[in-house]
Regions:
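Residue preference for a single heptad-register face of alpha-helical coiled-coils
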Residues: 14, 21, 28, 35, ...
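Broad structural signal for hydrophobic residues in well-ordered alpha-helices, predominantly aliphatic
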Residues: 9, 43-44
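Solvent-exposed interaction patches of small proteins and small membrane subunits
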Residues: 46-49, 92, 97
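Amphipathic alpha-helical coiled-coil segments
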Residues: 22, 29-36, 40-43, 79-86, ...
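Short E/K-rich amphipathic alpha-helical oligomerization segments
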Residues: 44-66
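Charged, heptad-repeat coiled-coil alpha-helices that serve as long linker/dimerization "arms"
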Residues: 59-61, 70, 81, 91
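Short, charge-rich amphipathic alpha-helices with coiled-coil/heptad character
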Residues: 2-27
Length: 97
């Protein structure tokens, strides 16, 4: 099995190799963003919350069980942080293109 390189794809499609690499990174980051958003949405839906703030309020008010809701909230917050990182990379790639 041979490895396909960005150079090979760029040459075959008569494109700039850097552009192929940027588009590949954008596509990968966009897919990661979609997965993160889906996972965060699943966590919020579990507690019928529209936002992290609402989930935190429900936990504080006793409307959601502390366990495992606190752990889920932490996971969702970490996902939000990762989402910010991905969005920053996407902005940089878009401005470079």
């Amino acid at each position: 099995m041979s490895v396909v390189t960005t150079r090979e794809i760029a040459n075959a499609l008569n494109l700039d190799e850097t552009e192929v690499q940027q588009q590949a990174m954008m596509a990968w980051l966009t897919e990661q963003k979609r997965r993160i958003l889906q996972t965060r949405l699943e966590i919020l839906a579990r507690y019928r919350s529209a936002s992290l703030e609402e989930l935190e309020a429900k936990i504080a008010d006793g409307e959601a069980p502390e366990h495992p809701a606190w752990e889920d909230l932490i996971v969702a917050e970490n996902l939000s942080n990762r989402l910010e990182e991905i969005n920053a990379y996407l902005r940089r790639l878009q401005s470079a293109g």
